[in-house]
Amino acid sequence: MSISYQDGQTSAGQPAMEHSVPLRRIIPAPVVTRALVGINAAVFVAMVLSGISPTEPNSAQLLQWGANWGPYSLGDQPWRLLTSNYLHIGIIHIALNMWCLWDLGQLSEFIFGRWTLLLIYTACGLAGSIASLWWHPMVIGAGASGAIFGLAGALITALYLGKLPFPRQGFQKTLRSLLTFAGYNLLFGAVGRGIDNSAHVGGLVMGLALGAVIGQFLTDSRESRAGRERFVFMLAAIALVAAGALVKHQRGDVVFLVQGRDALAKGQPDAAIKDLQTTVAKNPKDNAALVLLGNAYLQKKDYVQAEAVLKRAEANDPSDAAVQYNLGLMYQATKRFEPARQIFSKLAQSNPKDDDVWMMLGSSLDGLGRESEAAQAYQQALSLNPKNGEAYRGLGMAYRAQGMKAESDAAFEKAKELGSATKPQ
């Protein structure tokens, strides 16, 4: 965004020919803007030097460096609301954001002052992070966009509504550019993929509010203005804390969801059940939590509870593949092989590239004594994933049941090579 000052009158008060005065000639050095750009750039360079891809950092790397994510930010790591504003997802992301920050930061520093710019930037960045958690608590977020949109919003309302220490008409062109910037990017964020538009909206709303109020103090004496701005930012801090508390109350179940998932992965079903029950109590329609809870009961071999929980999930969404898969596991564990076969047969039709589904179908057919069909299902699983040792083991059992000793021994040997259990005695 190019920013310039349009002087609309001559010193004699007569209309003058329109001319542009470059911003760098009418404001002092933008120290804070340079510092903000420098910090963002330094974080990105440090990430790259640590071995992270400059174009496609993965989720784990972003979380390691302080990205915003509901299960962490709403838990015991709220500092991510701030650090995520200095973290970017690739070189194009940071280049575009720093370009905008450089332009908007200079103008903001000129109009509001250095420390006020820093406080607006920080408050709007936090507002963007909180808004992101409200709409997308399970999406990893990073970038300065919320703070940048906040600067744009503050400039819009200050230039449009504020008491300015310079002729307002000199910034009419800039105001139009700001409105175009905000409108276009909000529209693009709404239709584009992979863009956290909620952070844009959160930052913009905070910026609009701050600019509208602070803009009224721009012609006050330094002492009067400083006191009023302190009060405004105190109110902004209270609003941010209140908004954060509301989001934590309404979306905090994701913290227990991920804690339960992690406990389940560690083989701690009791701890998982405790966390997941908390999640389900807050959101009975959360099928992801219900599936994990059902799986935790399966690990404990509490099949009555597992079936009850998974049936609740099925009632929420009968087409949920994860629900059906876990119901199939439950039916197999309780030796109800026909309903298990029906489930895995349907899943294999809807997702024919999933080797695990074919393997479970083979296991169900094996339980029904349909060994020839079971062998075909295992072979299909192995055609999709030749390293599926459990499928080789199942194939060996199916061959053995048919009296095919050589084929059975070969399948068991392959399963052993891949680290699966050896053939049963």
Where are the predicted features?
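Structural marker of alpha-solenoid helical repeat scaffolds
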Residues: 282, 316, 350, 384, ...
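Position-specific recognition of the canonical hydrophobic site in helix A of tetratricopeptide repeat
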Residues: 264, 298, 325, 332, ...
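Helix-start (N-cap) detector for alpha-helical repeat units in TPR-like alpha-solenoids
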Residues: 253, 287-288, 321-322, 355-356, ...
